[in-house]
Amino acid sequence: MKYFLLTAALLAVLARPARAQTTPAALNDAAAFQQGTFQGAAADQAHYAVTYQLDSDDPKLIQQTLRNIGNALADERLKGKLTVELVAFGNGVAVFRKDQPYAAQLAALKQQGVILAQCQNTMREKKISKDELLPIISYVPSGTGELIIRQAQGWALVHP
């Protein structure tokens, strides 16, 4: 009986409903939302970093990813505070191929400081040479390794 009561008490404590964040920023955001004045989170940090993951050769997904990167770079809250990396691996290598229509968009993103990184494991597995890829890109040993490292460094990860 003693164990039953102890177990019941423990379950009662653990079964409490989760509470929403109660940080001052979260409370202010909630109040602004209720009043219809919420305009997005405040970018109160000095610097932000994000890695976009691209592992698909679907043209719509590639365009969406490039558009998402452009939108982040154009966000007034993040101006001068944002570092962006695009990591392509698997079928995502299509974005960096010379025979694909993305060169101008990628050059514009690189001009804005975006790191364009291709997984070398993918190149080996698919037997793709650097000559087949745009000369403006960089190379990383492993695309997933890059994501793991960046996340551990505090970078946000986006996989459109």
Mark where each language-model region is.
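Positively charged n-region of N-terminal signal peptides that target proteins for export
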Residues: 1-4
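Sec/Tat signal peptide C-region and signal peptidase I cleavage site
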Residues: 16-20
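Bacterial N-terminal signal peptides
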Residues: 7-14
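A cross-taxonomic marker for long C-terminal extensions/tails that follow the last structured domain
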Residues: 23-26, 97-160
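Structural recognition of the beta-strand scaffold that forms the well-ordered cores
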Residues: 50-53, 85-88, 115-118, 159
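Acidic helix-start/capping segments at beta-turn-to-alpha-helix junctions
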Residues: 82-96
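Short, glycine/serine-rich, charged loops/turns that create anion-binding
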Residues: 56, 91-93, 123
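N-terminal secretory signal peptides
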Residues: 23-85
